[in-house]
Amino acid sequence: MNIAWAKKRGNRVLMYGCGIGPVSSPGNRRAAGRIIDKYVDAITLRESHSARELQDMGVTHPKITVTADPALLLDPAPAEAVEAFLAAQGLDPARKHLLFVLRPWPGFEEKMPLFARAAEEYYETRGLVPVFFALEPKRDLPVAEATAALVSCPHHVIAAPHDGHLIVGMMGKMEAVVSMRLHALIFAAGLGVPLVGVVYDPKVSGFLDYLQETRYLDLETVAEDTLSALIDDALAQGVNGYSARRLRALAEENEQAARRLLEEAP
């Protein structure tokens, strides 16, 4: 209703850097499609799956542009601030680290030992110290702590700071990121850090498909060998600077769309 109210008050309406869905109820899909089509002037989307969702909802009036998530433009904190944060968490800057970003979800508990075994495997074979990172601490910290409790090698559990720039900077220090959380994957992609996605929701696979990123698997299909194969592949790739620059350029198109809408004659 905020969209309709804004338009009725004479404002131009831009849906900025959105992901659409899932909206499963037929009635809700019709209602959402009708409101968006009637009251929105332009939409920028973070991946192509959302464009298909809008098309299926019957949205044809607004100008739709597939760009990338605006979070990709979040710059890392200064190096000294990142190093101070990691030191405060007990991380040795001389060691290399593998980041796990896990979250509660139905079916996760039975897969938890597989993530713990992967953490131990890469410590034993590559010397990568596992870091279990709670991106949304209130929800994710119990999962991070429970997984870490299954690990016998040296490891760290970190709750995300409030400073997003610090989060991005920390991720830039990782050898690879294994994540269920979409925004951890977005941050890693924006930095070019090798990533492995664990999909619990179509928005995660939609983002990775848009990146043409094949290193992901559904949570229910996680197995020791398949998870290890994807992590091996990610580590072999190394940092992808070209991909990071391309994504940031796409994310900047959100701002360009907003500027165009403001400059249009009423």
Task: Describe the predicted segments one by one.
Residues 1-266:
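Active-site anion-handling motifs in enzyme catalytic cores
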